[in-house]
Amino acid sequence: MVEIHPTAIVSNKAKLGTNVKVGPFSIIEDEVEIGDNTVIHSSVKIRNYTKIGSNCEIFEGCVIGNIPQHLGFKGEISYVEIGNNTVLREYCTVHRGTSFDDGITRIGNNTYLMAYVHIAHDCKVGDNTILANCVTLAGHVKIGNYVFVGGLTPIHQFCRIGDYAMVGGASAVDKDIPPFTRASKNHVLLYGLNLVGLKRRGFSSETIKLLKEAYRILFRTSPTLAEGIKEVEEKLPKTKEIQMLLDFVKTTKRGIAPEASKRKLLISDEE
């Protein structure tokens, strides 16, 4: 049974699943789908072309499916898709995609967005990911699975953050953050592997050892990234994790965030 508060405005064209609850003063427009057992708290606005999965919880003041903040947007149909078991805390905003990408802004399953997170047009956020308070994604940002981003962190348009990475709070991300790594500071630097996260996710000691060696070669000792890639391919076994790391760095368009120790050496040389 669907429960809709008398003060809520819900279009009779919207598709609401079993046991959906809609709180006071919330507005749900025509072209909206909401899965079973999802809870929409008070004063939420869900606009056209939005699809929300099952067992989600959307807290007070969220606005989902608003048009993108993109000067090239001409009113074309585009979408927001949110997976199952995902939580958006107070005052999150999620904008629709644009024709400059695939037209979809997507948030995965089992993902947790804390208060005041902003997800801009065409972003992709993976499964089991946590974005802390006031994380701000510019357009076309891609964040993988099992990622944690600390609060008050802005992420530049088109940047990527790979699976199992961790970004410290109040960082400024203007380069790609490879999978399995730990990054922080303004502007963002790499600080080794996300060892705590990898152990929590059950990665073996052998896998972590290989990733440490790949990290050392790619980001600390090789004169260039291209030389580091070649050395890793020649010296290390082609495990799934090593291949994931190589695929990520090979396809960077924004560039990879600098390694902290290299950055310190560069500053010393300049001084």
UniProtKB/Swiss-Prot annotation:
Q: Which Pfam families match?
A: Acetyltransf_11, Hexapep
InterPro entries, per this entry?
Answer: Acetyltransf_C (IPR029098), Acetyltransf_C_sf (IPR037157), Hexapep (IPR001451), Hexapep_transf_CS (IPR018357), Lipid_A_LpxA (IPR010137), Trimer_LpxA-like_sf (IPR011004)
Which SUPFAM superfamilies does the UniProt record give?
Answer: Trimeric LpxA-like enzymes
GO terms (molecular function) for this protein are: acyl-[acyl-carrier-protein]-UDP-N-acetylglucosamine O-acyltransferase activity
Q: What is the enzyme's main class? A: transferase
Q: What is its EC number?
A: 2.3.1.129
Q: What catalytic reaction does the record list? A: a (3R)-hydroxyacyl-[ACP] + UDP-N-acetyl-alpha-D-glucosamine = a UDP-3-O-[(3R)-3-hydroxyacyl]-N-acetyl-alpha-D-glucosamine + holo-[ACP]
Q: In which pathway does it act?
A: Glycolipid biosynthesis; lipid IV(A) biosynthesis; lipid IV(A) from (3R)-3-hydroxytetradecanoyl-[acyl-carrier-protein] and UDP-N-acetyl-alpha-D-glucosamine: step 1/6
Kindly list the places in or outside the cell where this protein is found, as annotated in its UniProt entry: Cytoplasm
Q: What is the similarity comment for this entry? A: Belongs to the transferase hexapeptide repeat family. LpxA subfamily.
Subunit text: Homotrimer.
Task: Provide the protein name.
Answer: Acyl-[acyl-carrier-protein]--UDP-N-acetylglucosamine O-acyltransferase
Originating species: Sulfurihydrogenibium sp. (strain YO3AOP1)
